[in-house]
Amino acid sequence: MSIGPMTGLFLHEAAVGYTIIFSCSLIACMVGFICAYLVKTPYKAPVKREPISLDRFILLKGIPAGISLLLLSIPYGMTTNYVAMYAKQIGITSSTGFFFTLMAIGMAVSRLFSGKLVDKGKITQVIQAGMYLVCFCFFGLSACGWIIDWSLPMTTIFFFAISLLLGIGFGTMFPAYNTLFVNLAPNSQRGTATSTYLTSWDVGIGIGMVVGGYIAEVSTFKIAYLAGAILTVFSLFYFYGKVAPHFHRYRLR
């Protein structure tokens, strides 16, 4: 999620054509497909399938958490698609490919401590900590559009510091959210739990791409990121008031 945008921006800034950039994406997809094809799993005897129902595709107990995650992924979708244009719009001249480089570093750093805390059962606490950081980052990202009038060098430093913190925030929440969904599901629905987690994330990113582009078209990107920051606040309060109590009540492990 960080290496792809980073590589694409570096290639684009090096005057590489879009045909080559998308060809690289296609090659990466083919390599991923081959790697997935080579994965071997133990044979499992076919089991009788239950009638098709909603809970075969969506973990019903995970819907509250899915809503919270969806709200968080909307501004993330704005970031992965529009942060380069936003930086150009407000006047940041440094390569925005480094934004995703630092974001990837932040995600890697977060795994050094977040996984251990999740293993100790502090799932909701880890998610809330990540949410606080992400809320700050998106408000800060929006604020860059205003504070750049005072100092370009300081805004540039702040802009890239946000990317590092954003990587830490999302990197902290990703495994914790996945664990939260899985712990709400019986063993027979672990796949459904992961599917619900990923669907919520992907739908939010799609909404972020559409809504972020529309807001930027009628206004500016800094307003789009301000709207995204407000959504993270809604997600935080919803998680604190609904998702966390729901999880502690219905968790199975």
Where on the chain are the PLM-derived regions?
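C-terminal membrane-cytosol helix-exit motif in multi-pass small-molecule transporters
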Residues: L26-A45, Y238-V243
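Helix-loop boundary and gating motifs at the non-cytosolic
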Residues: G62-L69, S73-I92, F99
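Structural signature of the two symmetry-related core transmembrane helices
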Residues: L26, Q125-G140
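Intracellular juxtamembrane helix-capping segments at the cytosolic ends
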Residues: T172-A185
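Helix-loop-helix hairpin linking two adjacent transmembrane segments in secondary transporters
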Residues: M1-Y37
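Juxtamembrane intracellular "pre-TM" segments in multi-pass secondary transporters
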Residues: V39-L69
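A membrane-interface helix-boundary motif in multi-pass transporters
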Residues: H12-I27, Y214-T232
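Helix-to-loop junctions at the C-terminal end of transmembrane segments
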Residues: H12, S110-I123, A216-E217
